[in-house]
Amino acid sequence: MIFVLDVGNTNAVLGVFEEGELRQHWRMETDRHKTEDEYGMLVKQLLDHEGLSFEDVKGIIVSSVVPPIMFALERMCEKYFKIKPLVVGPGIKTGLNIKYENPREVGADRIVNAVAGIQLYGSPLIIVDFGTATTYCYINEEKHYMGGVITPGIMISAEALYSRAAKLPRIEITKPSSVVGKNTVSAMQSGILYGYVGQVEGIVKRMKEEAKQEPKVIATGGLAKLISEESNVIDIVDPFLTLKGLYMLYERNANLQQEKGE
């Protein structure tokens, strides 16, 4: 069984794969202040609930866009799982040809998504990941990672509206009953949701025009389903794209180590 961990700025998503299939997954808040023991006990509770144990896990891979948390997570893996985790970063074999000016600037989550997207859906491809920041990644027909777009996530937009406008409340991100709001909350929900849908459609349209291709558009992340239901540019929603990519990278690198006799 392989344990995969994707650490984002707001939430961390954990999963266990068995024989190539995602057996279970969990979501927890990203907390930069937790120790390796606190993380260890939290993960133990999650595993216990599914009838699993640390001993069932034979390998671990971690992707993180929050560097301060990595020390505690790596220590947790070594102390409780007795396994040194594979970390997505310099040295890991991704198989990607990254055309960024500085490839090291590409976030680990974007690399993982690209690996999974290419293997599962082919190329050319645009991957939209709705996280704390929303990222758009373009992979061309030769499977080269060409770059992308980064925008504030939908929750950041909603929080900015709440924090900077004294009389506006904090709202739940959900579809309102009509585009024209009949009260402050529904008007804000309409503005946030449909404003964001318009942004997604506009950016994807411009990316396609610049690429002079019609790449398939894959959406992932917490709000991917909600946005896709209102948009006409998203072809596939894959909520576990990142976890699948982590598993693929683990298998790829574990096989390479076996070939080298490590």
From Swiss-Prot:
All disulfide bonds of the chain are none
| Enzymatic reactions | (R)-pantothenate + ATP = (R)-4'-phosphopantothenate + ADP + H(+)
The protein's Enzyme Commission number: 2.7.1.33
Q: Which UniProt keywords apply?
A: ATP-binding, Coenzyme A biosynthesis, Cytoplasm, Kinase, Metal-binding, Nucleotide-binding, Potassium, Transferase
One GO term describing the cellular component: cytoplasm
Gene3D superfamilies reported for this sequence: 3.30.420.40
InterPro entries recorded for this chain? ATPase_NBD, Type_III_PanK
Residues at which ATP binds: D6, V7, G8, N9, T10, N11, A12, V13, T132
Q: Which residues form a coiled coil?
A: none
- In this protein, the active site sits at D109
Where along this sequence does the record place binding of substrate? Y100, G107, A108, D109, R110, T184
- How is the cofactor bound, in the record's words? A monovalent cation. Ammonium or potassium.
Q: Which GO terms are recorded in the biological process aspect for this UniProt protein?
A: coenzyme A biosynthetic process
GO molecular function terms attached to this record: ATP binding; metal ion binding; pantothenate kinase activity
In terms of CDD domains, this protein maps to: ASKHA_NBD_PanK-III (cd24015)
Q: Which cofactor does it need?
A: NH4(+); K(+)
Q: What are the binding positions for K(+) in this chain?
A: D129
Which family does this protein fall into?
A: Belongs to the type III pantothenate kinase family.
Q: Tell me, how does this one assemble?
A: Homodimer.
The record's function comment reads: Catalyzes the phosphorylation of pantothenate (Pan), the first step in CoA biosynthesis.
Q: What is this protein called?
A: Type III pantothenate kinase
Q: Which organism is it from?
A: Bacillus cereus (strain G9842)
Source species taxonomy: Bacteria, Bacillati, Bacillota, Bacilli, Bacillales
